Amino acid sequence: MLLAEELALVAINPSSGRHGLGLRAEINACLAGLLVAELILDDVIAPGDKTGRVAITGRVEPKGVTLAAATAVVIDKGPKLKAILSGMDRGLSRRIGLGTWDTTVAGLADAGVVEATSGGVRPRNNLIQGFVRDSTVAALRHAAAGDGALDLRTSALLSMTGPAKLLEVVAPDRKARGHARNRIDHALDGTVLEPIGRLVRRLISEAVAAAGAATVAATS
């Protein structure tokens, strides 16, 4: 399962089959970050000559349609990570007909973990293999509650639960959320994936600020 698919699965509420209301932009940014992280971990791309840039290695082919499309976005929008992350949703849609969220849940549906998308205004993906989500959530809770070093895949996934607004899922005990938030915020510190975590958060902050400014302008 791709890192982005794992995050999408955690974001799906088992009761509704949907992610939290109004969180698509935040989740899409995090999914884009995880797709790029996956490409780095697979050695399809590597950090570039400057911070915040990446380059195709030419050593490894991307695995599967989703990562192949994500690689095409990297080639088209790169080398700057910010442009790649900003363009991922539209880039995937242009290449495979699905945006970032729909691409990842389609992968989950193909694997039999969730049902195919259904519904109109607010589509849903009911869980089929709830134990898969339970296992992923349990691993994230263990990582968030601990103090030890994490492998890069776990670090990447844990890092994105913060900006994806999944803290309450990862740390259901309110008293433990301070520690969990610290683990999430610093999960990628000093790693090759740190620029991705930083830029995802920046993009979300900029989008929130722009939306706030637009609201003020519309009401003034």
Model-based region annotation:
Residues 141-220:
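Short hydrophobic helical membrane-anchoring segments positioned at the boundary
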Residues 38-42, 99-105, 135-138, 170-172, ...:
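Short, charged low-complexity intrinsically disordered segments located at boundaries
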Residues 73-107, 146-174:
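Leucine-rich, amphipathic alpha-helical/linker segments
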Residues 85, 90-99, 111-127, 131, ...:
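Acidic, Ser/Thr/Pro-enriched low-complexity segments and adjacent helix/loop capping patches
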Residues 9, 69-73, 83-86, 90, ...:
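Charged/polar, solvent-exposed surface patches and flexible loops
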Residues 49-72, 115-145, 151-157, 174, ...:
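Accessory beta->alpha helical hairpin/"wing" motif in late/C-terminal subdomains of nucleic-acid enzymes
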Residues 12, 40, 44, 109, ...:
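Hydrophobic/aromatic-lined pockets within catalytic cores
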Residues 1-93, 100, 213-220:
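Short, amphipathic alpha-helical interface elements at domain boundaries
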